[in-house]
Amino acid sequence: MAVPNELKYSKEHEWVKVEGNVATIGITEYAQSELGDIVFVELPETDDEINEGDTFGSVESVKTVSELYAPISGKVVEVNEELEDSPEFVNESPYEKAWMVKVEISDESQIEALLTAEKYSEMIGE
């Protein structure tokens, strides 16, 4: 199971890629494999504020609906509109095509509190 080293991870199975003051957020390969085939993705709007620990959307699979929890706080600056028409990207390419939102980071310390790839791998038993 892929756990890219350059990303940070939340205990709720979101990944975070930091570029300057913008964080790209998605769900991990482990999360999508547990959910099964993704059929619908609900995401916030551009300019919405999201807060660490709060839900910012959901992912619906053939098995269940799972909430998405914000690993950091900030303002949504971009949403991956392609997931509306192609939710299967979450299964096919969780770290590339299936990024969900880009957020302007409001508190850098929240990034430091996230898990490293090594710690996340330990958590999921990889």
From Swiss-Prot:
Gene3D superfamilies: 2.40.50.100. Binds 1 lipoyl cofactor covalently. Residues 22-104 form the Lipoyl-binding domain. Keywords: Lipoyl. The modification N6-lipoyllysine is found at K63. It comes from the Bacteria. Disulfide bonds: none annotated. GO terms for cellular component: cytosol; glycine cleavage complex. Its cofactor is (R)-lipoate. It holds the Pfam family GCV_H. The keyword Ubl conjugation does not apply. SUPFAM superfamilies: Single hybrid motif. One of its GO terms (biological process) is glycine decarboxylation via glycine cleavage system. Belongs to the GcvH family. The glycine cleavage system is composed of four proteins: P, T, L and H. The glycine cleavage system catalyzes the degradation of glycine. The H protein shuttles the methylamine group of glycine from the P protein to the T protein. Is also involved in protein lipoylation via its role as an octanoyl/lipoyl carrier protein intermediate. NCBIfam families: gcvH, PRK01202.1. PANTHER family: GLYCINE CLEAVAGE SYSTEM H PROTEIN, GLYCINE CLEAVAGE SYSTEM H PROTEIN-RELATED. This is Glycine cleavage system H protein. The lineage of its organism: Bacteria, Bacillati, Bacillota, Bacilli, Bacillales. The gene is gcvH.
